[in-house]
């Protein structure tokens, strides 16, 4: 992996929400626990903050009656069936283990991809960011959709393979293989190593 400039990079944590990957989440928790996604994400989030890399969480949430949910896909129909991700409820909040810090930003949206009808692009450009690093859930849905949009918007895109997960390892792997055409696929250890000189300078 080439170098990372923390002054021009943001770490975007996709859909780390209680109803999606919390302890009692109906969607992806089994695979998250199997591969340790949340612990890996925590390491990366902590390192990014120390290195001065802005952290942005994207979260998806709808009104209680889902009047703002356009259920044009099986995934979004499941949201209604499960009666989850209602704005203002604990389930729509960021996963308890990975709660945002005071310096982090949280962007809420209503579609699968984080850029659609949201302030995400504005937040990133306002911070002088041209490189976006993605982690989160699910690799083959919201992570991939948001990463593809970031590429189309002109950002350099990195996806941290071991800080993402999907419902199955096969879905996760297939998504990363596809994303490799548009993004740099890296690992938490590689990214932490790339940030380590900046981390050392920040803490000395």
Describe each region flagged by the PLM:
Residues 87-136:
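Internal catalytic-core helix/loop-beta-alpha segment
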Residues 179, 183-204:
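A charged, well-structured terminal subsegment
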Residues 139-146:
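Short glycine/serine/threonine-rich phosphate/pyrophosphate-binding segments
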Residues 141, 164-168, 193:
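Short gly/pro/ser/thr-enriched loop/turn and capping motifs at secondary-structure boundaries
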Residues 50-53, 128, 154:
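Glycine-centered short loops/turns at secondary-structure junctions
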Residues 133-136, 154-169:
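A short glycine-rich beta-strand->turn/loop micro-motif centered on a GG-aromatic cluster
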Residues 1-101, 195-204:
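Active-site acidic carboxylates
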Residues 168-181:
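Active-site-proximal loop->helix
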């Amino acid at each position: 992996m080439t170098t990372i400039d923390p002054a021009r990079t943001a770490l975007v944590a996709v859909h780390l929400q209680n109803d999606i990957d919390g302890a009692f989440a109906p969607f992806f928790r089994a695979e998250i626990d199997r591969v340790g996604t949340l612990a890996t994400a925590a390491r990366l989030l902590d390192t990014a903050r120390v290195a001065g890399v802005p952290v942005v969480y994207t979260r998806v949430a709808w009104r209680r009656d889902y009047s703002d949910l356009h259920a044009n896909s099986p995934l979004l129909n499941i949201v209604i069936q499960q009666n989850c991700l209602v704005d203002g409820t604990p389930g729509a909040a960021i996963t308890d283990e990975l709660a945002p810090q005071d310096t982090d930003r949280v962007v809420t949206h209503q579609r699968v991809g984080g850029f659609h009808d949201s302030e995400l692009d504005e937040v990133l450009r306002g911070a002088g960011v041209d490189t976006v690093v993605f982690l989160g859930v699910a690799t083959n849905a919201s992570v991939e959709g948001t990463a593809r949009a970031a590429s189309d918007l002109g950002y350099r895109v990195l996806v941290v393979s071991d800080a993402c997960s999907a419902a199955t390892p096969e879905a996760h792997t297939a998504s990363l293989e596809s994303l490799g055409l548009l993004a740099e696929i890296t690992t938490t250890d590689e990214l932490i190593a790339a940030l380590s000189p900046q981390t050392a300078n920040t803490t000395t």
